[in-house]
A protein has these predicted regions:
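Active-site- and interface-proximal helix/loop "cap" or "latch" segments in soluble metabolic
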Residues: 26-326
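Positively charged n-region of N-terminal signal peptides that target proteins for export
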Residues: 1-9
Length: 326
């Protein structure tokens, strides 16, 4: 009987030890990063056809483990096209949606003869990326910009060069975070347009500014990692609708511009745009999407909490993009 009791006690102690170890074991935290790949082009207006400026913004947000392998990936593209006439008049858009937001209305199946819609093909590419290193992801691009057999067989037959370009930048922007394998990656983009007609003395413009917010969100709906950026492309044209936009100059996001954005040098700001955007990012961590949206403030310059944190720029772009994380 004593022997049985001793054995039972040993078993119970071992079970308790295993339980304690299991309770103490925490999920591995991952690196988190967002990348933005931009391409822009412009055409002249003619008597028969409006000129147009097109800014294509591919965004990827990733989490990466200690071995440098992607744990999760989310991709979206803002294909912003604006127009102007041969009389130098800027044309206002009804609104802007990303390809993922358009869903079936992007019409790759109906009008393009594709087997799957864009969002389904993007999902397929994301699934291929998971578990791969950056070098392995770069190797997924085949001749002509489309994917390798592994990508095509997964259901992604569109070009993937820009996806990989965005992912490569996301790797370059990786930072330690509280994101884990159970976190959900979300991506939101909000685009605003501003226009000015051309005169004989001054070029007109049709500008699009796309604000991007990415986040890793936990099971309680709280942000555990956040990133943001803004891509502002100003398409210019003369009174005859001839494009004066320099497409040979690579478009850069505000973060990529860094100190060259010039808020301190030319705008007399205390901090550069990216520094103020970082301050807003820091406030997002620990908050729900609704709480982030509430940071906008009545004047769009942020609540007192935002201003005290060191962000004095307009934040309505951030909050509008964040609102799409739900």
């Amino acid at each position: 009987m004593k022997k049985f009791i001793c054995i039972l006690l040993c078993v119970l102690m071992c079970a308790a030890t295993v339980a304690l170890v299991a309770c103490d074991k925490k999920e591995e935290t991952l690196k988190f990063g967002m990348g933005v790949h931009i391409s822009a082009s412009a055409t002249d207006a003619t008597a028969d056809k409006e000129g147009q400026g097109k800014a294509t913004i591919n965004v990827a947000v990733i989490t990466v483990d200690a071995e440098g392998k992607v744990v999760a990936c989310q991709i979206d593209t803002a294909d912003n096209t604006v127009k102007y006439t041969a009389e130098g008049k800027a044309v206002a858009n009804d609104g802007f949606k990303t390809k993922y937001e358009l869903g079936n209305d992007y019409n790759m199946v109906t009008y393009g003869g594709a087997a799957k819609e864009w969002f389904e093909q993007a999902d397929a590419f994301e699934s291929v990326v998971v578990g791969k290193t950056l070098d392995e992801i770069k190797a997924l691009v085949a001749e002509g910009g489309k994917g390798t057999d592994a990508v095509i067989n997964a259901g992604c037959t569109i070009t993937v060069t820009e996806f990989v370009g965005a992912i490569e930048k996301a790797f370059a922007n990786l930072a330690d975070s509280n994101a884990t394998a159970s976190s959900t990656l979300k991506l939101g983009m909000s685009t605003e347009q501003s226009t000015a007609d051309a005169t004989e003395d001054k070029n007109g413009s049709n500008q699009v500014a796309t604000t991007i917010v990415a986040a890793a969100i936990d099971a309680e709906g709280k942000v555990v990692a956040a990133a943001n950026d803004c891509v502002q492309v100003k398409f210019t044209f003369d009174a005859a609708g001839v494009s004066t936009y320099d497409a040979t100059k690579a478009a850069q996001s505000k973060r990529e511009l860094g100190a060259n954005y010039g808020m301190v040098a030319y705008g007399n700001a205390a901090k550069e745009w990216f520094e103020q955007a970082d301050a807003f990012n820091a406030l997002c961590v620990g908050k729900t999407v609704a709480e982030i949206v509430a940071l906008c403030g009545a004047d769009n310059y942020g609540t007192d909490e935002v201003k005290t944190a060191g962000c004095t720029i307009l934040v309505d772009g951030f909050t509008k993009a964040a609102d799409k994380l739900d």
